[in-house]
Amino acid sequence: MRECISIHVGQAGVQIGNACWELYCLEHGIQPDGQMPSDKTIGGGDDSFNTFFSETGAGKHVPRAVFVDLEPTVIDEVRTGTYRQLFHPEQLITGKEDAANNYARGHYTIGKEIIDLVLDRIRKLADQCTGLQGFLVFHSFGGGTGSGFTSLLMERLSVDYGKKSKLEFSIYPAPQVSTAVVEPYNSILTTHTTLEHSDCAFMVDNEAIYDICRRNLDIERPTYTNLNRLISQIVSSITASLRFDGALNVDLTEFQTNLVPYPRIHFPLATYAPVISAEKAYHEQLSVAEITNACFEPANQMVKCDPRHGKYMACCLLYRGDVVPKDVNAAIATIKTKRSIQFVDWCPTGFKVGINYQPPTVVPGGDLAKVQRAVCMLSNTTAIAEAWARLDHKFVLMYAKRAFVHWYVGEGMEEGEFSEAREDMAALEKDYEEVGVDSVEGEGEEEGEEY
């Protein structure tokens, strides 16, 4: 089997985890107590969903997941919630005091007290796997636990499981809406630390998702539940090919192979379509061509940036539901004729396509309409450098005055780490810039030194 272990870190990670596992259970027909009436092979078997769930002899399905937070309140909600019987109590790990939005606390002081326990639990999960494929790490950039503890964990996972792929789903600080003043510090420190340990990071920005909820679902005041349910649809689309049998399945390492042209340039944009409320869906026929087109609309992206200003390096379309390759090819042919979609000249306009026959499932009482087909597009585009540039700018403004730095230094960090992280991010921006430049003058020599 090709198992995946999900690791949910900090409040954002845990709450997205709740939404994802709720959706997985609905998709596979697993009840909140872990029983699965449709499963005939008790205690194992080679069903595709066993990549995400392990089975006990009694026929209970247990998620291959770990929830970690440095303070207990958020995970306590899981312990008392609807799905409390689904998780093994050892999978829900909490500390006593939180990281207080401070990367240094998550990474050094508080984080190191709990890291060995977490790795021990992950080791137990890994031992139950026959062919562990990799890890999915869910976290936010802005929080102390999400940034600090995740980067510590990624470093340790690289040591313990060197060859396994590690994919991140990161909540990127929204341009306008901020939940903490020190978000730019935490984000840049964590990106710098995890850059070499992460194979692929899908970024999601709350503001982009707020706008999608407002615009497409007519929710006036979206809550985190609305946001997380939308995020979970995307995560589900990305992982569907690991959990179901399909026509064109895509596996974890395949994403990396097709989306990451250079090791550092591993931040694909996710776009999902159709995001539509039940009232609207009733009057629209969402053909393959329509939903494919919708993916190239900046309005449907999960990060605020404009791909029309950047160039695409790679593109991966994951369809699910009633979709046949013929329709997909026609839709892609139409896309290629459009001038607004530019590829870098060193990359043939390749689209990787995955097709899965399992139609998208929706949470009952949720906001999304039940549709016959959906598509999730993962595209690696130079436009995402806009997002980094915005963040770097905020970082520089604060760091020029050394604002809030004493909180980090007081927890055992050195000031040099800030400038080091800043330089690394500047280099990342530069990398994106160079990748987008047309390779006319035979750029062989300068690429040699970077990679």
From Swiss-Prot:
GO terms for cellular component: cytoplasm; microtubule; microtubule cytoskeleton. Mg(2+) binds at E71. The modification 3'-nitrotyrosine is found at Y282, Y451. GTP binds at residues 10-12, 15, 71, 99, 140, 143-146, 179, 183, 206, 224, 228, 252. A motif (MREC motif) lies at residues 1-4. The modification Omega-N-methylarginine is found at R339. Gene3D superfamilies: Helix hairpin bin, Tubulin/FtsZ, C-terminal domain, Tubulin/FtsZ, GTPase domain. It is an enzyme of class 3 (hydrolase). It catalyses: GTP + H2O = GDP + phosphate + H(+). One of its GO terms (biological process) is mitotic cell cycle. The modification Phosphoserine is found at S48, S232, S439. Pfam families: Tubulin (PF00091), Tubulin_C (PF03953). GO terms for molecular function: GTP binding; GTPase activity; metal ion binding; structural constituent of cytoskeleton. It comes from the Eukaryota. Heterodimer of alpha- and beta-tubulin. A typical microtubule is a hollow water-filled tube with an outer diameter of 25 nm and an inner diameter of 15 nM. Alpha-beta heterodimers associate head-to-tail to form protofilaments running lengthwise along the microtubule wall with the beta-tubulin subunit facing the microtubule plus end conferring a structural polarity. Microtubules usually have 13 protofilaments but different protofilament numbers can be found in some organisms and specialized cells. Tubulin is the major constituent of microtubules, protein filaments consisting of alpha- and beta-tubulin heterodimers. Microtubules grow by the addition of GTP-tubulin dimers to the microtubule end, where a stabilizing cap forms. Below the cap, tubulin dimers are in GDP-bound state, owing to GTPase activity of alpha-tubulin. This is Tubulin alpha-1B chain. The lineage of its organism: Eukaryota, Metazoa, Chordata, Craniata, Vertebrata.
